[in-house]
Regions:
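Residue(s) in the substrate-gating loop at a strand-loop-helix junction
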Residues: 28
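SDR active-site lid
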Residues: 57-123
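Non-catalytic terminal and boundary segments that flank Rossmann-like NAD(P)-dependent oxidoreductase
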Residues: 138-151
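Active-site helix of classical SDR
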Residues: 7, 44
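Active-site-adjacent segment of SDR/Rossmann-fold oxidoreductases
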Residues: 13, 33, 54-64
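A short helix-coil junction within the Rossmann-fold of NAD(P)-dependent oxidoreductases
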Residues: 9-22
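Active-site loop immediately N-terminal to the catalytic Tyr-X3-Lys motif
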Residues: 33-39
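Catalytic tyrosine of NAD(P)H-dependent dehydrogenase/reductases that use a Tyr as the general acid/base
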Residues: 4, 41, 49
């Protein structure tokens, strides 16, 4: 796993020099919210988000901070390659959700400066999916522990 190799290589040096440092791991929104037909890809992205969360906790009292980038749809050449594989309606939806790569760069820079952990690039579509996932998890907890419900 590339990010783990990079961390193993550079983290000791970052800690040793003592200056403020920051690690940004690039995951995907698929590492936060599962999508259809992405079991292998999504699992690797979930693992990267989890590793980043643990790393952030491990480094909380050091000079190194951590972020995880979770873009959903970015307007890159990947989208143009989808044309042959998806319907026109799906492609239209993807294009409507796509954010400009410079927006992603701006979000990453802002997160580094503000030491923000989760970096999202779209506050509309991803917010809806994230809310649905969190609501489903909380609903399951409420069903399993009804006597402990907190309104």
């Amino acid at each position: 796993m590339g990010p783990l190799n990079g961390i193993n290589l550079f983290l000791p040096q970052m800690l040793e020099h003592g200056e403020a440092s920051h690690i940004v791991n690039t995951s995907s929104f698929s590492g936060i919210h599962g999508h259809g037909n992405q079991s292998a890809y999504g699992s690797s992205k979930f693992a990267l988000v989890g590793m980043s969360e643990f790393l952030r906790n491990d480094l909380k009292d050091t000079n190194v901070s951590v972020s995880v980038l979770c873009p959903h749809v970015v307007d890159t050449n990947i989208i143009s390659k989808l044309k042959a594989r998806v319907s026109a309606d799906v492609l239209k939806m993807i294009n409507q959700m796509a954010v400009d790569p410079s927006t992603v760069g701006d979000q990453v820079l802002k997160a580094i400066i503000e030491k923000e952990f989760y970096i999202f690039c779209d506050g509309v579509h991803t917010r809806e999916m994230l809310k649905a996932r969190c609501d489903a998890m909380l609903s399951a907890m409420d069903r399993q522990f009804p006597e402990e419900e907190n309104d």
